[in-house]
Structures are given as C-alpha cells and as structure tokens.
Swiss-Prot record:
Organism, as annotated: Escherichia coli O6:H1 (strain CFT073 / ATCC 700928 / UPEC)
Gene3D superfamilies: 3.40.50.880
Protein name: Peptidase E
Domain of life: Bacteria
Gene transcribed to yield this protein: pepE
Localisation per UniProt entry: Cytoplasm
Amino acid sequence: MELLLLSNSTLPGKAWLEHALPLIAEQLQGRRSAVFIPFAGVTQTWDDYTAKTAAVLASLGVSVTGIHSVVDPVAAIENAEIVIVGGGNTFQLLKQCRERGLLAPITDVVKRGALYIGWSAGANLACPTIRTTNDMPIVDPQGFDALNLFPLQINPHFTNALPEGHKGETREQRIRELLVVAPELTIIGLPEGNWITVSKGHATLGGPNTTYVFKAGEEAVPLEAGHRF
C-alpha cells in the first residue's frame, strides 16, 4: 500500500499544503487522477474545499474531483488512482463515508494500488478507529471503526503544551485515559509538521519534530525522522 498521512495541512509562514507538496510529488509515481473526500469540512462548503485542494495540486499535474459531486461515488473510488481525504471534523467525515458506503471501496482500492493521502482527520480515518481524534463529536458516526489501512492509532496535531493557569488535561493525559480502557492500542502522537509515509511495505516517520509513541503501562518513547514502524 501507498499512504501519506500528515498531521496537519498548514505550517506557520507557509501556504496551505505547501510543506506537503514535495511529499505528494514523491509518491505520485505517475498517478494523476484523484478523488477528494471533503466531508470533514464543516465551516466551508464541500465545493469550496474541493476547489481549494484542486488549485494546490494542479501544480503537480493532478486533477481532482470532489466525491460529493459525482453520480456514482463508489464507482469513482473504485477507479481512482489517488484518494485524498481532507481534514476537519473526523466524526462528520466518518459519518458521511459510512452513510454513503465508501469505507470498504476506499480500503479495497488502496490495497489494489491507489495512493491514499490524508491530513489531520484524513490521517485519523486511515487508522483502525477514530478514537484518537482531537475533534468534538458533533455528529454520531454510528461507530468508531475506520479504514484500518494503517495498523496503529494516530493522534494528529500532538502537543503536550499546557497554557499557564489552564487546569484541563494534557494531550498525553487524554491518551493515557484511552490506554486504560483499550490497553491493546499503540498510539502515535504526531506533532504538526510531521507525517508518516507507507511505501513498499515500510512505514517511515518524517518531519522536523519529535514524535511520541504511547503504550499502556510504558513511558512515552520519542522517535525522530527516519524511524520505521
């Protein structure tokens, strides 16, 4: 399988998806036709989200079609060279994909060789479940099971920063809560600016920041770019 799982879409001082373009270009390998799944977008229309994505990827010669705009979305996915899943609200994303019967077709086409690109919520969707999202559950997706393209859980936008005077939990504390009730999980705290690529049977960590892996009953393990999972 070929996957590009990004923690986020924007970095300070850079345009939207600018940091991701070289990574996408490296994994295209001749693929030029993409379907875009915009369902995580809540405060922007799916048309606008698709147009925004298409404009950025045009520089790589990739044509983008919004899955919401086609007559037969399942067929569009089955014939896709690239499946792109944008960030936003993960619960809304999973709900829409489940209701439209898209989860199994996405899994199948990626296993057959399509490239999967997802950022933030799109990276969450590639995991076994969406239980490590940071998002508010604004809708009920009728279960948390997701695509299971990547075998570990990703927590995008990972940071342990706590504003002075703030009494809420840190991100690690919330992850530890999940590991109490689901100790079988391995959770990757993927900070902004980092990504995971899957290619030729290997999953490799990229990006300038330290990533952390959490397991029940163990200290967090710091990982740097180049680590293979």
